[in-house]
């Protein structure tokens, strides 16, 4: 005890001595300069540091317009930094953890402002205990070589195909594909079961939950030596034996999803729920419905929660992704509760019965909206003629935007500024827009293409957008088509012509309306007269020598579209009944 007391006293004296020295230094520095409030915990997180990064995959580098964002003067570990690096590799280049594990090389280099650098292996999984101050990082370069070793490529080429069949409720289905293994690969029954479950879900839509609730679920492995082994898909028990893939002849999968008689009675379970959005709760008159399948897993329950959030409050997956809070609480009748994050992809294998749930409370706190709108200048060139545009493209809300969103805005201004609609764009010779970035790069997008790019870009990185459309139309806005009218065999010369717009392709329905209009104005023949006429038709003569006869009394038209410039002339022929016949 005396020895312990002596050590404690010695340590205390040492601390007091060092503290006294520090007091003097701190007093001197405090007198020299004011307190830096940015380092205070009260102000922590309000200022950000943006660290530029580059990604090189298989020797090819890509310009990254965005940056890694950290809190200013934040001390982070190499583990946290690695998670951020893996995140941008996944989002920007689609490289997952598995790809990194199987890659030839995966590393990133941290460049510090003092001129030093540190190289970290992404495959090692070993981290130093050192912390880095985010304000000291100058840049980060990520380098991944996904090329496999030569021996791995040889292995991949030697695949072994195993045929399989699926029988559900006594009905068998021909499967054209096979289960694929590496030749002479030793696999466990657990791995084999995972493959069987995968094809059950992809081919027949049978999930793990369906298997658990099924009456029977098994598969039979038939070996080339004539033996076979039956495995229960519901047991979850696996032997330690390994199978050589080349010894398997075929696999038969058999599932009986029919419920027992006691489960056949249909019952609809209703679970009340409430939604709290940004601190404001609303009364929900409807309930979550669990019909026929009262047992559910948390993944399906989360999908139902997201559905009612979208339906009741208009909150989409995107809104949830950027929300400050997004979770729901399941209250059970036994007094227990469970909180689940809506943005989490990790679900427990537990099943929940609807009758055990008392209520569900959904809580969402959305992020603040963007304080300022963003504007991008644009130009429109139609058939080589460009006009100055005084307004800009306006982007509101999320600072990131996809090419699909830009295409919608481009179509909108084409319609508003130049009267060019979807139909004109569809038949245009050329319809593109070029996005010019501030870093000097550019990207040309076809307006008529179905853009499937998932890349998002920051509006602030766009310098301007040039829209270019070539419609192939001539300067004349309208075509004038000569026509004749013959009533009861008597034709009269018509000095005027049918005026038809060149701005778009026309249909026979459109032409019908034009013909009926001139019949009424020139000969006083109304729609009612045409209805009771013995014959009412017109013939369209095209410049290529073809012709088309159209019945004016019919409301059925061919879906063909054509240009007014292709019409040579139109002959209209109407034969009316005599008055005596008409009165009968």
Swiss-Prot record:
<dbReference type="GO" id="GO:0005886">
    <property type="term" value="C:plasma membrane"/>
</dbReference>
<comment type="function">
    <text>Binds various plasma and ECM-proteins.</text>
</comment>
<feature type="repeat" description="MAP 5">
    <location>
        <begin position="475"/>
        <end position="584"/>
    </location>
</feature>
<dbReference type="Pfam" id="PF03642">
    <property type="entry name" value="MAP"/>
</dbReference>
<dbReference type="InterPro" id="IPR005298">
    <property type="entry name" value="MAP_dom"/>
</dbReference>
<keyword id="KW-0677">Repeat</keyword>
<feature type="repeat" description="MAP 2">
    <location>
        <begin position="156"/>
        <end position="265"/>
    </location>
</feature>
<keyword id="KW-0732">Signal</keyword>
<protein>
    <recommendedName>
        <fullName>65 kDa membrane protein</fullName>
    </recommendedName>
</protein>
<feature type="repeat" description="MAP 1">
    <location>
        <begin position="45"/>
        <end position="154"/>
    </location>
</feature>
<feature type="repeat" description="MAP 3">
    <location>
        <begin position="266"/>
        <end position="374"/>
    </location>
</feature>
<feature type="signal peptide">
    <location>
        <begin position="1"/>
        <end position="30"/>
    </location>
</feature>
<keyword id="KW-0472">Membrane</keyword>
<keyword id="KW-1003">Cell membrane</keyword>
<feature type="repeat" description="MAP 4">
    <location>
        <begin position="375"/>
        <end position="474"/>
    </location>
</feature>
């Amino acid at each position: 005890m005396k020895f312990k007391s002596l050590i404690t006293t010695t340590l205390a004296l040492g601390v007091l001595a060092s503290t006294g020295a520090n007091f003097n230094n701190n007093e001197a520095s405090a007198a020299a300069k004011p307190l830096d409030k940015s380092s205070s915990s009260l102000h922590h997180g309000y200022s950000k540091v943006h660290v530029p990064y580059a990604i090189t995959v298989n020797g090819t580098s890509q310009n990254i317009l965005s940056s890694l964002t950290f809190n200013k003067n934040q001390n982070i570990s190499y583990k946290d930094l690695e998670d951020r690096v893996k995140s941008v590799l996944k989002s920007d280049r689609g490289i997952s953890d598995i790809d990194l594990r199987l890659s030839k090389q995966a590393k990133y280099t941290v460049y510090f402002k003092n001129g030093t650098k540190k190289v970290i292996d992404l495959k090692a999984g070993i981290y130093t205990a050192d912390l880095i101050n985010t304000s000291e990082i100058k840049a980060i370069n990520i380098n991944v070589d996904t090329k496999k070793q030569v021996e791995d490529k040889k292995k991949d080429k030697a695949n072994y195909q195993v045929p399989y069949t699926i029988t559900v409720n006594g009905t068998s289905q021909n499967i054209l594909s096979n289960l694929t293994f590496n030749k002479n690969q030793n696999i466990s029954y657990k791995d084999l079961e995972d493959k069987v479950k995968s094809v059950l879900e992809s081919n027949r839509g049978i999930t793990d939950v369906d298997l658990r609730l099924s009456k029977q679920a098994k598969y039979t492995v038939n070996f080339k030596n004539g033996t076979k082994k039956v495995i229960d898909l519901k047991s979850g028990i696996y032997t330690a034996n390994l199978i050589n893939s080349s010894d398997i002849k075929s696999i038969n999968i058999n599932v009986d999803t029919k419920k027992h008689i006691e489960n056949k009675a249909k019952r609809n379970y209703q679970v009340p729920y409430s939604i709290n959005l940004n601190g404001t709760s609303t009364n929900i008159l409807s309930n979550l419905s669990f019909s026929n399948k009262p047992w559910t897993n948390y993944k399906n329950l989360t999908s139902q929660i997201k559905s009612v959030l979208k339906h009741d409050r208009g909150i989409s997956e995107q809104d949830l992704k950027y929300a400050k809070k997004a979770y729901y609480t399941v209250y059970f009748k036994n007094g227990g509760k469970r909180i689940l994050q809506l943005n989490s992809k990790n679900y427990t294998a537990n099943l929940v019965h609807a009758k055990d749930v008392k209520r569900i409370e959904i809580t969402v706190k959305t992020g603040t909206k963007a304080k300022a709108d963003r504007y991008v200048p644009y130009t429109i060139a139609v058939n080589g003629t460009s006009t100055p545009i005084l307004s800009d493209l306006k982007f509101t809300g999320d600072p990131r935007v996809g090419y699909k969103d830009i295409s919608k805005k481009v179509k909108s201004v084409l319609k508003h500024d130049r009267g060019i609609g979807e139909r004109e764009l569809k038949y245009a010779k050329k319809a593109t827009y070029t996005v010019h970035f501030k870093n000097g790069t550019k990207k040309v997008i076809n307006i008529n293409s179905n853009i499937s790019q998932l890349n998002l870009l920051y509006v602030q990185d766009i310098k301007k957008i040039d829209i270019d459309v070539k419609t192939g139309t001539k300067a004349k806005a309208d075509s004038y088509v000569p026509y004749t009218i013959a009533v009861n065999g008597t034709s009269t010369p018509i000095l005027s012509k049918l005026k038809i717009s060149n701005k778009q392709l026309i249909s026979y329905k459109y032409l019908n309306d034009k013909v009926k209009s001139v019949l009424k104005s020139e000969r006083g023949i109304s729609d009612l007269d045409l209805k009771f006429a013995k014959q009412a038709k017109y013939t369209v003569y095209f410049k290529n020598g073809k012709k088309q006869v159209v019945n004016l009394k019919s409301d059925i038209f061919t879906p063909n579209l054509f240009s007014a410039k292709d019409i040579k002339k139109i002959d209209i022929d109407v034969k009316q009944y005599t008055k005596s016949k008409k009165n009968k």
